[in-house]
Structure formats: structure tokens, C-alpha cells
């Protein structure tokens, strides 16, 4: 094979096909020779060789199609190769003058020893080459400018392979005999024989591939990419390509090891849906040849194909008999295998030929959660008052259609709230220029996308994995519009190349899922069922029996959402990288935008630079400054958002499973996970359905809360936003207000200290400018969405993180945001204040000011009466009056409450006033409340208001007082730092550290927190900050140890347990009291993957790789706070479900619960009752038993597990605190 001196360009190809020692004649136009031109021998001058080499590299793309022929000649291991005729330049044969040469069927090994023949015709050839060079180059340029058609490629390359190459001689003989016989019966006989023959290992090097039952995380990156490729080919009608790649990989020993049963099954299922019996049998031959055992999905594919082809009953009967012999039950085909309704019907048709009386397993009644904690939630007896929405059925149906249309479009255009101005001549010109450029970019991107797809298709034909089917999922114009949308939203300072790649692949996947539901008929089925579902929620409709939304959706027999598995992380990163590079290479603009028609030179719109972040070199794509300036001049009036980033216009779908709920069509994860991690989703999938009912119903309830925008507050915020902001009130200023960098140009003789000072000043200005731009953009998105949703009703679908904590899905505008974001939101459905609602409004107002935290409720109410004039003045003249509201801790929420109080007190009947304002009730350091309850710690319970008291207990003030006692003692002993701290130990100094100790903050982190607080004190001697922060953090931890002894004991037990579990090579797992499985995803980042090539190599950590060792430090430090978070989420969910049963509106921000003013007393009662019920369970004992069973039962680790088992069983003993006291604690949540 050494005779094939292969190169990347035309020269290499022609040398490969030319006999040694004889020159070639000029080829005809349109042939390989015509494109490449005659080549000089190696005796040509270096300058001429350099020119040839440059031409070669320029022609690579067109000539790559001919490389397949040479690779084919080299691939002796592939026996059946069918090649279309490949036209090449006519070359003289050795010793012959006819000037023709047919490409050799097989290159002779002795060719390398051929003796060169002296050439006497070189002078004439060189002279002719000079005369025709210019003409040929002109023709070449014209040809290169023509789009490369896929039809041309298919005419030049080999056909797709269908028949497999089998390693087993016996099976290969059977296949050969089968292909020689009549085309009807042999395939049925072969199918029966294949299914009856037990698979066996063919040789030592043919290893059993991973079973289809194994998790995706256990597959290598190459296997994940291949499996995703096969599945994607099925979705894009590229089944022949998938079969071809499967045959190529199966025919090569090394590549065969990558194939798994799932891959064979995917291709089999595709052929089954087409009724292609012969091709299906080919795949089964390969399955048996690989030594694999067909599973339920394999049999389902075979039966489906026979059902479509109307096969005889004998073959079907033998297939069912073989299933039975292998222990596979017929009923499992319809219960354990995920098939579409059409596929199930076809399989059933085949089965009925043999067993006409067979019927599908009866649909069992929906299972009911029997958890003790949820027994009352699902009880049929007792009084139930599930709330209804305030909107009629017809209105809700119209809202549903709007939301459906929005998700089908995948994007939403929103008018920007930047200060509107009449477009000047300059602005109009900039917008016209921008439109012209975008039209050009759209054409260039379409052309680049087609060329890329053709190139990637060639790679598949050559038997290599490529992203070709993934690029075929969406219409070309849809992909281009998505790329241009990303380009428009790119910030001026640029975006990380990896982040951009990830975003592009995520958007592609989301659009694909929506489009697939559109073409599969899923949308029509959803419309029919959703209209019925709305009868449960509409104000003017009734249902036979009140029930929870999930239960009603299941009773309707609603269609199961398509289970579209997310693409593996390697595929996501490769696809995103490809699209990002395409965007960079295809978008160009004139170097002078002022005179674009006169400027012939084009420059890239995006350029690639490197920056250092945390000592890591990060690739960044930055827009050209001229393009940024053009965008600023154009001042386009709209912003474009993804549909999933905008609140919903109709009630979300109820969560019914880990993959079905929230948005109508757009894919949404039930559990947010680290990028690439799959363990959480697999845990949820294997979890019994009833175990998740509590979490699913709580998330549905939170998402069903209807919202509206507070228009008066929005007007005021917009007024400040458009008037250069007000950072003191949380309204960011525009970047133009950022401090200007120094303009001084220092001479070379300037002192190094002066240069360093200037560099620091410049870096500070740049940092501030970036932060201001980020804050301004965030506020712009939030306020633009609020303006867009003004006078509308909308909903916020929820999901949860791996600990069970809940979050709204739309990221830009929700109630988990800042003070401004919360003030802009209010309940769409109001409720009369009733006899006590106005009092709760006033108490809520005082709570927001932060002025009376340690006072009882009656004094807070009295304070509200004292400042009523300021309250009314703030409501009436917020920006021109006394501005009392601006001094509050939460100024904008305080202002919104002032307006609500003013409306209520001025109403003729305040009790009848319909209030929409959410009233908050906060836990008293909720993490410590859970710790005190777990340990039955009397001292700790009293500090965090678990124990009834006439006044609220403030744990932060208590810790500060205890630290002051220690400081006074040390000061008396003459300790200098203790003397300096006299008068500086306040609640504010220690609050953050006390609050975060419960969530695992270390002494180092606590010291930094205290240092920050001390630096904020202008009169504290700054030279003592470091020493004082060290001293205070020790005293804070010492105070907590004395005040919360039970808490520290539980923390230590959890930390030590996690440390030992990690040392055994496992990550920590547990199950929340509501049944949600939790697994900590912290593993060592040892396996960093790299995708090379292109403008930049990108690296990423494969978080889904469960073979990596646990990160012991993160596991042990994360277990205590994560466990407590799982408890506070369980408490919140129980409270939400019981409030829903009582007809209350309820939402939460973790440990801050919101409801109407009229219902605060009821919510507080439910909150206290559910906390007592939760902690009446033996939570730590249950955790201990679970961990012992999970990590101490493996026989091979019995010796290692002895210490772990001993630690796990040493549960800290509880104290004597009586939990029932919580029910009488007024300030438990207040």
C-alpha cells in the first residue's frame, strides 16, 4: 500500500492513481484532471511546488469525494464494496501510448519497487501548462463558487452498504445461501433460525457489548455518540445511513466493540416501521454474530415488522415460542417496552394472528401514595375545597391557544422598554444597513449549512460518525434564524465559546422536540385533552368529583408526552461547536459601514480571542466593535426570547412523571441537574410512580398560581430606569454612567508603582463597566417582560433541584428575583380582606421595613398606625413626597404594600376590599429550626421560635450577645483584639455567619464574611480587621456550640457518615420524607473531554461518568446542608398540598411562604402542623437504616463497611424538647 503516496490535495490523489515514472496528460474539463491540472514531477522547483501546494489545499473540499476510492483500495478487510464509476483524468499506462488507465482493483504491493522511466516530454508539458494555467484557474474558481450538490457526491462515492459482513463463517454461509434463494420464504426461515439459535462468543476478541439495560452513564463517549446517531437517523428518515454505519462498524473488529444491543435495536425498529423484513433480518444476523441476546425491544421490532408485512402465522408463532423459552413474557411487550400507539397496534395485530383471544393487560386503577405524611392529602373522606381560577372556561381556552402558538414558534418578540425616541435619519439608516447585512448573513448561513451537511454526509458514507442527521432535524431556515437570534443577543463584551456552543445545542434540541410533536399528531391530542382538563380549573365549569390536577389528567387518559432523551453531552458540545463556528465563518460585513457599497474588503462580524478567568484560558467570541456600534445606533425596538424563558399564558400541564409536565410542548426536566449528569433522571425513572406523587402534586400546585403585573409599581420603576436608573433603589444605571478609564499615557520613564496603579485603576473601571452592563441587561429583560405581560394573567411553571427545592422555570421574571421583581408581581386572583386581613397587611408592611423585627405583633401593628401618614404619603407621592418607603430594607415591596394599605383604609368597607398583594411569613433561621427539631434541642428550639414566646426570639441577636460575653471576659484578661472590638459586635456583624453555619460554611468562609462586615464599619480601625475577624469567627462557632449542642452533634454525624461513604467509593444517597430520591453529584473532575479542531478546542467535564471517584471534601461538606434543604423542601410541599386542599393560594420562596392577607392565619396553622408531623417521623433513624442497607450490604466490602456501619448506627440521641409546643408558637413563621 506504500505505492499510494496519499496527500490532502489533488497532487496526492493523482500520484496515487498515476503509474510510477510517467507524466499524465491534461485532463478534460469536469474530470479530476480538469480540476487539478497536470502535475509536475518531484524535480520541479521549490517555488513551483509551493504554488502547487497552495492550489492543492484550496481544492481540498471539492476533491475530498475522491478520497473514498483510495480508502476503499486500502480497506482490504471490507469484502463487499460496490463502487459507482469514478471518473478521473486519463493517464498514460506504463509502456503504453493509448493514454488511458482504469483505476486498479487492488494496488500491488510491489509497486513501490517500480523503476522510474525517464521522461522526454516534460518540456512540452511545462510549456502547455503555462499557456493553459490562467484559463484553468478561472474555470476552477467558477466551479468552486457553484454549490456542491449532494447528487454529485452520490454519483462519485460508493453506495450505502446493506448486507453485513459477518465474522462467523457459519452465519455468513447461512446469509449467503439465503440471498441466493427466492426472495420470499428464506427470510422467514432465517428469522426463525436466528431467534432459536443461542448466541455464543465467536472468539476472545469479540466481547459482549454492554446490555441495553445499562444506563447511559456506563457507555463511553463514543458509544453515546453512536447511539444518539442511530436514534436521530430514525427521526430524520435517514435509516439507510444508520444501517450503513452499523454494517461498517460491525464488519471491523475494533469498531464492533463499540456497538451495543440498543444500537442494533434502534435500527431494527426503524426497519420494522417501514416493513422492511429483509433488512431487519440483516440486523438480526449482526446481533447473533456479535454474540448478543435479543431482548423485548428486539422481539417487538420483529413482531411489528411481521404485522406490517402480514406474515404467516408460523413465523410469528415460532417467534413467540422463542420469547417464552428465553423467559420473556408476552404481556411485557406492551407494559415494559416504550412504543408509540401505532407501533403497539401493529405488534398486537401480529400477535392476534397466533393468539386471537389475546388482549392487552387491563389498565390498573391509578396507584395511590400510601405514605403516612400524605395520607390526609389523598384521603377521599373529609372536607375538600380545591380552589378554582377566577377565569371562565372560554377565556382559558383562548389563553391555551395563544400559549400553544407561542411554543410552536419557539420564540417570543417583546417590545424593549429602553427610552423610546422618534427614529432619526441616522437611526433609520442604521436599521436599513442592519437589515441588509442580516439578509446577506441569512443567505451565507444557508449556503454554509448546506455545504456542511454535504461534507458531513460524505463522512457517514465513508463509515464515520458525523453530526449530519442532527443538522437535518430542523429546517435550514429555522437553524439560520436561530443563529441570527443568538448573534443579535450576544453581549458587547462577548461570550464564552463553550457557553455559546452549549446554548446553541440546547436550542436546537428544544426546537426539535416541539417540531416532532407537531408532525406526530401530539399537538392535536394535547388540544383535545387540555380543553377537558380546563373544566377542573375554570370558574364556570364543574367536574363530577373534586380531585387534584394530576389525578384528573390521568383520569382523562391524557396522552403520555414523548420521551425524548436529551442528547449525550459529547454530541451536544460537538453540535454546538459546529454551529458556533459556522456562525463565525459565514457572517461578514464591510470593513467600513459608513460606505458599505464602496468597501470591497470584508471583515468577520465575530472574532475569537482568549481571556484568563481564574488562571484558566477561556476562548471568547466577541462581536466586532463596528457591529456593536451599529446595533446601538439602530436601537431596535424589540427583544427576542425563547418561549421557555417567558411565563406561560395558560395553566401549566400537571406534572405526572419525571418527563411530563410544565410547558405544553417544550421539554422541561422535573429535576435540575449539573450539566451532563444523568444519575438524577435515572433515579427518578426507576423510582416507584407513587413515591413521587407528593412532589409532583406540590410542583403542580405552585405552578397553578395565577399572577399579574402591579402596573403602578412598574410605571415608577420604568420612570427611573429610563432616567439613567437609581442604583440605591436597585434600578441599574446604563453603561454610559460607568466610571471612565484613565486616559493618561505614561512616559516610559514613569515609576513602576505608577504604572501598576494605572493598570489597577483601568482593571477596576472595566470590571465595574461589565457589572453595570450585566445588571442593566438583566433589568431590561425583566422590565420588558413585565411591560409585555401588563394587563395579562400568566403562570410560572415550577421544577426542583436535586435536593427537592423548588424553582420557577422562567428565569428572567419570577418571584424568586430581587426586591424590584417581587414588587412587580401580585396574585391575579384577589380575595376580600375579611376581619383580620388589613391587620396582616400592616404587619407585613412593618416586616418589610425591617424596623421592628424583635417586637411582638401588637407593637408592629401599633407602629403601622403611628406612621400611617408616611404610608399614605408614600402611596400618593412616591417620588415627590417624603419618600419614607425608600428607607426600608425592601423599598419597592414596601411601596407596593403602602399602596395596598392606602387602597384598603380608604375603601368604604375595608373588610370587603379585594386584595391581590401576597403577604409573606418567614421562618426564623429555618435551617436551625430543622436541626433543633431533629435533635429535640430545648435551648436551640427556644432560640429559633420553636417554643411559644410573648416576643419573637432573634437567634442572631442571641449569638451576638453570647459573643459579647466571651469578648468581655477576654478583654478583662488583657487581650488586645477583644478590647478593640468593644461596641462593634452587633447583630449585623454575625448574622451572615450564623445563617450559613447551618449550611456548612467553614471557619475560613465565616472569617471572610465577618471581615466584609467589619470593613463596612467606617469607625472600626482597619488595621485590626484581619485579627478581629479571626477572633470573632472562633467566638461565633463557640457560641453556636453552646447554644445548639444537639445541632452540632447531628452535623458532625452527617459529615462523618458522608466521609466514610466517599472513602468506600460511593456518593451519598438518601430519600426525602416525601419519597424523592436524592444523590449528591460531586465527583472528582478527572475525566475532562476535549473536542479538537476548528477555531478552538473545547474541554468539558463529563459529569455523567459514574466511574469517577467521589469528591470526598464536597460530599462530606455538602451532606449536612443538602439534607436540611431536603427537609425544608418536604415541609414546604406538605404545607402547599394542605393549603391547596383548604382552598388557599400558596407560593413560596424556599422558607418564605406567601398567601392572601385574609388567609395568613390559616396558612400559619397549616405550616406549624405540618412541621410537627414531619418531625414526628423518625427521620434520622430512617436515614440510618437506609444508608446501612444501601452501603453496608455488599459481601465483598464487609470489612471496609464495619466502621461505616458502626458510625451510621450511632445516631445522635435526641433531647427532651416537646414538638407539640411548635403548634402554639406564634413566631415560628412570622
Curated annotation (Swiss-Prot):
Compartmental location: Mitochondrion
Give the Gene3D superfamilies listed for this entry: 1.10.287.280, 5' to 3' exonuclease, C-terminal subdomain (1.10.150.20), DNA-directed RNA polymerase, N-terminal domain (1.10.1320.10), Tetratricopeptide repeat domain (1.25.40.10)
Which PROSITE patterns does the annotation name? Answer: RNA_POL_PHAGE_1 (PS00900), RNA_POL_PHAGE_2 (PS00489)
One GO BP annotation of this record: transcription initiation at mitochondrial promoter
Keyword Glycosyltransferase applies: no
Q: Which GO terms describe its molecular function?
A: 3'-5'-RNA exonuclease activity; DNA-directed RNA polymerase activity; mitochondrial promoter sequence-specific DNA binding; RNA binding; sequence-specific DNA binding
**Which reaction is the catalytic activity of this chain?**
RNA(n) + a ribonucleoside 5'-triphosphate = RNA(n+1) + diphosphate
* Record region (Mediates interaction with TEFM): 802-1230
Class of enzymatic activity (EC top level)? transferase
Q: What is the effect of changing residue 641 to L?
A: In COXPD55; results in mild reduction of transcription of mitochondrial DNA in vitro; reduced DNA primase activity and
Q: Name the reported effect of residue 1013 to C.
A: In COXPD55; results in decreased transcription of mitochondrial DNA in vitro
**Active site, renumbered:** 922, 991, 1151
Listed Pro residues bias regions = 732-744
Q: Where is this region: Disordered?
A: 18-55, 95-115, 731-750
**UniProt keyword list:** Disease variant, DNA-directed RNA polymerase, Mitochondrion, Nucleotidyltransferase, Primary mitochondrial disease, Transcription, Transferase, Transit peptide
Q: Where is the transit peptide?
A: 1-41
Q: Which Enzyme Commission number(s) are listed?
A: 2.7.7.6
Annotated InterPro entries: DNA-dir_Rpol_C_phage-type, DNA-dir_Rpol_phage-type, DNA/RNA_pol_sf, RNA_POL_N_sf, RPOL_N, TPR-like_helical_dom_sf
What disorder does this protein's entry note?
A: Combined oxidative phosphorylation deficiency 55: A mitochondrial disease characterized by global developmental delay, hypotonia, short stature, and impaired intellectual development with speech disabilities in childhood. Indolent progressive external ophthalmoplegia may be present in some patients. COXPD55 transmission pattern is consistent with autosomal dominant inheritance in some families, and with autosomal recessive inheritance in others.
Reported function: DNA-dependent RNA polymerase catalyzes the transcription of mitochondrial DNA into RNA using the four ribonucleoside triphosphates as substrates. Component of the mitochondrial transcription initiation complex, composed at least of TFB2M, TFAM and POLRMT that is required for basal transcription of mitochondrial DNA. In this complex, TFAM recruits POLRMT to a specific promoter whereas TFB2M induces structural changes in POLRMT to enable promoter opening and trapping of the DNA non-template strand. Has DNA primase activity.
What PANTHER family has UniProt attached to this entry?
DNA-DIRECTED RNA POLYMERASE, MITOCHONDRIAL
Q: What's the family?
A: Belongs to the phage and mitochondrial RNA polymerase family.
Protein's UniProt name? DNA-directed RNA polymerase, mitochondrial
Traced from the root, the source organism's taxonomic lineage reads: Eukaryota, Metazoa, Chordata, Craniata, Vertebrata
